[in-house]
Amino acid sequence: MTGNLEKLFDSHSEWIQSEGEDGEQLSLERISSDQLTNEQLQMLTDSVLTECSFTNIELRENDFYHTEMYSCKFNNVSFGEVQFIKSEVNDTKFTDSNFETVNFNNAEIFDCIFLECTFSDSTFISTGIWNAMFDDCTFVNIDFESAYFEKIILHNSKFINPINLDKATKIVINIGTVENPLLLTHEESLKWIIDNSI
C-alpha cells in the first residue's frame, strides 16, 4: 500500500504543477492518517477524500484548497493556520478538534457534525454551511462577513466576540432538532448569536 500511495501522491504533485495537463488528481478512499507521512499530509490540496479518517494529529499550515471531502472523520485533530479555501466538505464529522487561525473562505459545508470543537481567530468569510450541527462548540473572534448559514443547529454552543456578524449574507439557525426543526429568521438568528455571546 505504501508504494501505491507514493505513486498516487507523485502523480498528484505532477497534476498540480502542470495544472491538470499531466498526472492525475489524488483520490483517496478509506485511508487513515497513520498511513500517511507528514509530507503526504501536506499534499492534500485539491484532492478528493472519501471515508478517510484523521485521528490524534496536528495539522499545521496544511492547504485543503479546493479539496473535496465525503464522509470523513476527524477526531482530536488540531488545525493550525490551515486553509479550507473553496473546499467542499460533505457528511463529515469533526470531534474534539481545535481550529486556530483557520481560513474557511468560500468553502461549502454540507450535512456535517462538529462535536466539542473550538474555533478561534478564524474566518468564515463568504462560507456556505447547510444543515450542519455544532454541539458544544465555542467560537472565538470569528469573522462572519458574507457568511451564508442555512438550517444549522447550534446546541450548547457559545460565541466570544463575533466579528462582522451584521455583514453576514444569511444566517438561519435551527434551535430545534433535525426531526422537529424550529427555524429562526435571519434577524432572529443574529439576535440568538448575540444573546449567546460572552
Regions found by a protein language model. Give the residues of each.
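Tandem repeat scaffolds
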Residues: 4-10, 20-198
